[in-house]
Each structure stands twice: as C-alpha cells, then as structure tokens.
C-alpha cells in the first residue's frame, strides 16, 4: 500500500490552494497518494480561475476513503466560517484559524497512523495570531501538537541543506539564549536526519555566530565559549563535524560539495543563502517530530494570490520529498 501524505491548505487567502491544485493535478503527482486537508469551497473558487485543466474534487471523511487516480484530488473538508467573505491577499482571522485547524487535523491523522507524512502549504503568521493561535509558525505549532521538545527547521535542496539552531526569535534574544546544549542537540539531529535521507557518512559544518567566526575572540566570544566546545563534544561521539566555520564562506563550501549540511545559528543566516540558491525548489522540513513534515520554502505571496501566477515547484517537491521520506 502506498504511503498517504496529508497536504494542508495553509492560509486560504494566499497561494496555498493554487499551488496544491497545480501540484496534484498535473505532472508526476497527478494521481499520487495525497489527501488535501482544507476548505472545499475555496478550492472550487480557485478551480473556477482555470488554473489547471478540469480536475475532480473528491470529498472524503478519512484518508482510507480516498481514490487515487489522475485528475482526482481527494480532500477532507475543513470549512471556513464564512467562505464567501474570504478575500485573496488580505490578512483575515478566519483564514488564520482555518490554517490552524488544517494543521491540527493533519497532525491527528499522522499521529493515528492514517497518513504517513504531512506537506504544508504556507500560512500567514499575522492571520494565525489574529485568530488567537499565538505560535511563531508551523514548526513551533507542530512541536506543540506532538509534544516534541527537541526539534529544528531544515531547509533542503539537492545541493545545499541547512539546519537551524534558532529560527523565529529576535536576534538579540538569540544571543542571550544561545547555549551548548542546544547547539549539540542540533548537530546530533543533523547527523540523524542526513542518515535517514541516505547519507552513510554525513559531513556537517557548523557556522560561527560572529564575523569570521569570531576571529579568535576579536569579534565576540560565542565561538570560544559555546560553538567550539559543542563541536568537539559531538566529534567525541563519532559525528563528522567541523567548525566553527566563517559564515560568509561555509555555505559556498557546502554548495560545492565539501559538506552535506550546514548548522546555521539563526534564521537569516540560514535562510538567505538557501533562498538565494534554491528559492523555487527549496523545501522546509521539521526535524525531531514523530513523523515527516515538509513544506514549500516560501510564504503566502499575498500579492499574487488567486491570480494564476503562483509557481508550484517548491510545493510539488515538498510533497514528493514527503512521499520519499515517509
């Protein structure tokens, strides 16, 4: 039996519904074993824009009822409170609430074994918060729903892979909370993740915090007090890890094949190089959950929502990768 992937709609006022339809209606994923969790009426409104050739929406109650065939998209309906009031490209509380409910439903299905992985379309954090769900993003929400203590965001392309020590936290607060335990945990998670996806002997680089990785304490002492001891501790456990590496060169070295993954210290340190080099094919993966979760590596793109202009490549790759890793 094929592994079933739950695909969550994300914010319905963004490009999520469109990139899901484009991903599942055409190409390699047409007829794939994926079940959408989202608002049926919103999907119908997107289909009315003729973004793809004719496709059938099959409403199901549970994944076991799905019929996987070309031209068919299976969907478990999570209705909006007022679907006709939904407007594209605008922050709306009901859209944030729907995105939350879709994640909650998909997580319950995964924890029950009814689906084997989750691929998520982007949500809008402001809309999520306006609905009363005060999470920084998907990663933290999924960790809460699954009671996962140790987790990390991975950005994944064929040529560059990055895992983050911190993500949705103010840079000033990151510097105040950085500690050896977290750095060592993320290095270990990187090693486990890479082995899970097929690397037999992963090579992991750990980026420094400061310019030139601190230049032996000239530009900060986080490398001396935290990063270097963490790297040495993980080497003692048998992990092939290097660092602290200067952040301005380590990503190029990884891109050219010297390392299999970079441990980034904070959000933009990891996101900028990966989005520069792999914006359209990058995938976001949450390491440390009890199931595989992947996501398109971009936002809701409100400026082009419901226009037919959204590119589905990152969403399609995230679904394919979820199937591969499940």
Curated annotation (Swiss-Prot):
Keyword field contains Cell cycle: no
Cofactor remark: Binds 1 divalent metal cation per subunit.
Q: Which UniProt key words apply to this protein?
A: Carbohydrate metabolism, Metal-binding, NAD, Oxidoreductase
Q: What is its EC number?
A: 1.1.1.408
Q: Where is the signal peptide?
A: none
Molecular function terms, GO-annotated: metal ion binding; NAD binding; oxidoreductase activity
Q: Does the keyword rRNA processing apply?
A: no
Quote the catalytic activity from the record.
4-O-phospho-D-threonate + NAD(+) = dihydroxyacetone phosphate + CO2 + NADH
In this chain, substrate is annotated as bound at 138-139, 275, 284, 293
Coiled-coil annotation reads: none
Cofactor(s) in the UniProt record: a divalent metal cation
Which positions bind a divalent metal cation?
168, 212, 267
What this chain does, per the entry, is described as: Catalyzes the NAD-dependent oxidation and subsequent decarboxylation of D-threonate 4-phosphate to produce dihydroxyacetone phosphate (DHAP). Can also use 4-hydroxy-L-threonine 4-phosphate as substrate.
Q: Which family does it belong to?
A: Belongs to the PdxA family. PdxA2 subfamily.
On assembly, the entry states: Homodimer.
| Protein's UniProt name | D-threonate 4-phosphate dehydrogenase
């Amino acid at each position: 039996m094929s592994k079933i992937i739950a695909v969550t709609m994300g914010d319905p006022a963004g490009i999520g519904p469109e990139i899901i339809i484009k991903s599942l209606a055409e190409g390699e994923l047409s007829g794939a074993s994926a079940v959408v969790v989202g608002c049926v009426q919103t999907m119908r409104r997107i289909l009315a824009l003729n973004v793809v050739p004719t496709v059938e929406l099959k409403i199901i109650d549970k994944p076991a009822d799905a019929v996987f065939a070309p031209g068919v998209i299976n969907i478990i309906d999570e209705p909006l409170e007022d679907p006709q009031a939904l407007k594209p490209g605008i922050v709306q509380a009901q859209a944030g609430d729907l995105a939350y409910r879709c994640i909650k439903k998909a997580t319950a299905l995964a924890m029950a074994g009814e689906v084997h992985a989750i691929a998520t379309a982007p949500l809008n954090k402001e809309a999520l918060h306006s609905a009363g769900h005060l999470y920084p993003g998907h990663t933290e929400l999924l960790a809460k729903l699954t009671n996962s203590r140790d987790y990390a965001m991975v950005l994944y392309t064929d040529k560059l892979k990055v895992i983050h020590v911190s993500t949705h936290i103010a840079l000033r607060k990151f510097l105040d909370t950085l500690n050896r335990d977290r750095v060592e945990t993320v290095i270990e998670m990187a090693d486990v993740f890479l082995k899970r996806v097929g690397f037999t002997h992963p090579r992991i680089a750990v980026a420094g915090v400061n310019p030139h990785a601190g230049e032996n304490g000239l530009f900060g002492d986080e490398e001396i007090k935290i990063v270097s001891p963490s790297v040495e501790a993980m080497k003692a456990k048998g992990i092939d890890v290097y660092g602290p590496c200067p952040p301005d060169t380590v990503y190029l070295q990884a891109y050219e094949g010297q390392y299999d993954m970079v441990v980034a210290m904070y959000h933009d340190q990891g996101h900028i190089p990966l989005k520069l080099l792999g914006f359209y094919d990058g995938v976001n993966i949450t390491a440390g959950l009890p199931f595989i979760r992947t996501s398109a590596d971009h936002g809701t793109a409100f400026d082009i929502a419901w226009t037919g202009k959204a590119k589905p490549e990152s969403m399609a790759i995230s679904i394919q990768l979820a199937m591969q890793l499940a």
